[in-house]
Amino acid sequence: MLSTLSLSVVNAQGCSDAGFCTMGAMRPGQPYSNNLNIMLKSVELSQYIGLTRFNDRIYATTLDFNLGLTRKDAVQFKLPYMAAKGPLGEMQGVGDISLSYTRTLKKTLRYQFNITGGAKIPLGNSGKVFEEKPLPMYYQQNLGTYDFVLGISFLTNKWLVATGLQYPLNTNQNQFSSKPWIQEGTSSEVIDQYSSSIDLDRGKDVMFRVERSIRKSNLGVSIGLLSIYRLNKDERTNPTTKERELVKDSDGLALTGLLGLNYMFNVNSTLKVIYGHRIIKRHVSPDGLSREQVVGVGYVYKF
């Protein structure tokens, strides 16, 4: 049996909270073993905090369960509890479920290839309000969409290279615009920072992760980059004309730098610290996924 104490991070922009960048083959800090017969099972409880450019604080407590079905097959279940606090109020609730299946395509004594297929399932419609005023996506606990996820990774003792696709399948039901907030007396300087997101169609995302690990005795250090490229612009309903429109500057690259540290106390217990910081951001994020930096703490029990 193996237990791990970890401090983990979600990328600063691009992935949803506990999003597809941490599903299956795309997860950071994946354990590598040259034991060809190993089957990994784990339960993780993690907590993180993220800071947005608008001084909102986003919290997520996530249950992450991984079950090795065979030596080549595994399933993962994730459920976050989300909370947001900022200039527009405080909200909290259960986030979206993530389900994935991972298959090891090839494993040798030196490397392995993994592939993941999965989905994000909404437990809400992203339509929460505060004092009868619709909240922007930064304050929603759910993305409000069913998402298809596909990913693949190459893993060695020193390197992790992964790529993936997240494909939203429907429009959410968010109704945020600045007008009702301004009518109720909220400063336009505050509320106009948030992009309107009425009936938002989120764009498709492609992820690429590269991570280098150095291990000396009980100490390990990792450094990496995580890029998310939005293939197409988000689409929403204009609050004035009521017509559909593309959101300018909502597509393109978001890049995050990652730095990690782990210390193995013994074969059963390891402490990990990872910090992520935004390097390149998209100028407009009506989906509420932008973070300037994110850091968290978690406990993993492996058996």
Sequence positions of predicted segments:
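Transmembrane beta-barrel domains of outer membrane proteins
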Residues: 64-66, 102-104, 151-155, 162-164, ...
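Surface-exposed strand-loop-strand hairpins of Gram-negative outer-membrane beta-barrel proteins
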Residues: 35-62, 89, 137-141, 246-247
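Outer membrane beta-barrel transmembrane domains
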Residues: 39-46, 50-51, 75, 186-303
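Outer-membrane beta-barrel translocator domains and adjoining extracellular loop/strand segments
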Residues: 48-52, 56-58, 82, 87-92, ...
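Residues that define the transmembrane beta-barrel architecture of outer-membrane proteins
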Residues: 57-61, 91-97, 111, 142-148, ...
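Short loop/turn motifs that connect adjacent beta-strands in outer-membrane beta-barrel proteins
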Residues: 14, 27-35, 72, 106-113, ...
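Outer-membrane beta-barrel biogenesis signature
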Residues: 10-52
